[in-house]
Design a protein with these regions (language model features):
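Short cysteine-rich clusters marking metal-coordination/redox-active sites
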Residues: 88-91, 109
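Short, mixed-charge amphipathic alpha-helical segments
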Residues: 71-87
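Long, charged N-terminal interaction/targeting segments
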Residues: 1-76
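Short metal-coordination and nucleic-acid-contact micro-motifs, chiefly zinc-binding Cys/His arrays
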Residues: 83-87, 95, 102-105
């Protein structure tokens, strides 16, 4: 998935100060993030990105925009957040919600689940 590094750097460049330019999830979701960014920037090239992370097993993409198309932006984000719940965070392959020790949730492929100590939720 390293071929996405340039595109991920472009997404990072949209992260507003004082927020860290960290994308806090594994590379299996990088394609989702790049595609989400492309769709968002087509609607509002000046949108501000605050944070991209994994939370409760799904992708979270936090933005701000003064665009009159704010609801269209939210629809794009909602679409990619839903897609993340079907995509392994490590491999980008189809995945399902899995539960690990301590109740941590991740979306993982069945091949990766046991390797990381998770089981289907």
């Amino acid at each position: 998935v390293s071929y996405l590094e340039d595109e991920i750097e472009e997404v990072r460049s949209y992260i507003s100060e004082p927020f860290s330019q960290t994308i806090d999830c594994n590379q299996g979701w990088h394609q989702l993030i790049v595609d989400c960014h492309r769709e968002l920037s087509a609607i509002d090239p000046d949108y501000k990105l605050y944070q991209v992370k994994e939370k409760f097993g799904g992708l979270r993409y936090y933005i701000d925009s003064s665009s009159k198309d704010y609801y269209a932006l939210r629809d794009v984000i909602n679409k990619f957040e839903r897609l993340s719940l079907q995509t392994c965070e490590y491999t980008g392959e189809p995945g399902v919600l899995a539960k690990g020790k301590g109740g941590w949730m991740k979306t993982l492929s069945t091949e990766v689940m046991s390797e990381y100590g998770y089981e289907k939720a």
